[in-house]
Amino acid sequence: MAGHSKWANIQHRKGRQDEKRGAAFSKIAKEITVASKMGGGDINFNPRLRVAVDKAKGVNMPKDKIDTAIKKGTGELEGVEYIEIRYEGYGIGGAAIMVDCLTDNKVRTVAEVRHAFSKFGGNMGSDGCVAFQFKHCGQMIFAPGTDEGALMDAAIEAGADDVTTNDDGSIEVLTPPNDYMAVKDALEAAGFKPEFGEVTMKPEGENVFAGEEGVKMQKLLDALENLDDVQEIYTTAVIED
């Protein structure tokens, strides 16, 4: 058994995604465009695109928006040229934060990210300053009550790296990043549908915040998340109710 309430954290995150559905569509469309530009528009031959499209379907993004984003990447439609950038830094209490961005203006983006860090008690660091605190992997979370033994057998057979039952009864399955969709497909075919899944940078440790400190930390994360150029935020911070 391991971890804080992963299930509660996932439900909270899904709720926030629902509240910001329009922004989520925009961010995922960017990722689809970049993925299709880099690897082509066929999800069968482009793992990154397949993950992005799977994510789009997970938030009920309309098919026409997905198709438009792909065509912008392949050049069938005119689109914006995006640059991928990752910024690293610290929140209050030294919590590690990584910020992945897609931007058409690097100068604007770095200024906005730095401002968000400094305004809410954090600070930007140099490249690599916190990356060692995260593991690049595929992650799936299954609901409490899932048959742990059967899921573990199916996950191992499908090529998962690790299966962990959390304190709250939810089950976490980790995969190599490039094998995420193959493992997910195999588990769904075996009758196990994750409540949440993504290719992510999973924190190796936790900085737990509560009360006023938790509120401060959430404000920093919200400020970063609300920036148009920010795609994903990864952090060691765990904010308890």
Swiss-Prot record:
Superkingdom per UniProt: Bacteria
PANTHER family with a match to the protein in the record: TRANSCRIPTIONAL REGULATORY PROTEIN YEBC-RELATED, TRANSLATIONAL ACTIVATOR OF CYTOCHROME C OXIDASE 1
GO CC term, one of those recorded: cytosol
Stored Gene3D superfamilies: 1.10.10.200, 3.30.70.980
Keyword Cytoplasm belongs to the record: yes
One of the Pfam families matching this protein, by short name: TACO1_YebC_N
SUPFAM superfamilies, alphabetized: YebC-like
Chain intervals for the UniProt region annotation (Disordered): 1-22
Claim: rRNA processing is one of the keywords in the record: no
Protein name: Probable transcriptional regulatory protein Daro_4067
GO biological process: regulation of DNA-templated transcription
Family: Belongs to the TACO1 family.
UniProt cross-references to HAMAP family, sorted A to Z: Transcrip_reg_TACO1 (MF_00693)
Primary location recorded for the protein, binned into one broad class: cytoplasm
Keywords: Cytoplasm, DNA-binding, Transcription, Transcription regulation
Source organism of this protein record: Dechloromonas aromatica (strain RCB)
InterPro entries tied to this protein: Integrase-like_N, TACO1_YebC-like_2nd/3rd_dom, TACO1_YebC_N, Transcrip_reg_TACO1-like, Transcrip_reg_TACO1-like_dom3, YebC-like
Subcellular location(s) of the protein: Cytoplasm
GO molecular function, one term: DNA binding
